[in-house]
Amino acid sequence: MRILSVTAQKPCSTGSGVYLTEVVKALAKEGHTQTVLAGIARGEQMDMPDGVKAYPVYFESEGLPYPVVGMSDEMPYISTRYKDMTEEMTVQFRNAFLAVLDEVIEREDPELILCHHLYYLTALVRERYPEKKVYGFCHNTDLRQMKTVSYT
């Protein structure tokens, strides 16, 4: 099976990133074709297991000129909290991730999409590709962050 794993955060840098990487490794051992789409800082690389295709979305770049988004108030790297994003930042995020997502879907044609965190990117993936099987992983930090947002 062709499987795409998606996260807006750096893989391997946080608990959810380590979880994503371990799921990718386990599924690769089962013979599945793996692709990962992830947000990273410009100038960084995605270190994925052998045979796994990596599609980075670069933060701190012209199209996405702020640090990688994070699901916790304090991340192990410089980050942007979702609740601090402006409307302009949200549009930049959407455009940058959908451009790479469209490329991945066209090139890799995943049969299954695994999205990490029940937040904005998972919603974008589901909305853009309603015909695809999309599963969302909740790592609990997303629920905690939702409680801190003012909905007035």
Language model features with spans:
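Active-site proximal beta-strand in glycosyltransferases
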Residues: 112-115, 125-145
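Short, flexible loop segments at the rims of nucleotide/cofactor-binding pockets, characterized by
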Residues: 12-13, 88-93, 143-149
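Short amphipathic alpha-helical segments
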Residues: 48-49, 125-127, 149
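Short N-terminal targeting/anchoring amphipathic segment
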Residues: 101-119
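Conserved small/polar residues in nucleotide/adenosyl-binding loops
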Residues: 152
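N-terminal subdomain of nucleotide-sugar transferases
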Residues: 1-58, 108
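Short, well-ordered alpha-helical microsegments
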Residues: 43-45, 120-124
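A conserved catalytic-core segment of Leloir-type glycosyltransferases
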Residues: 39-107
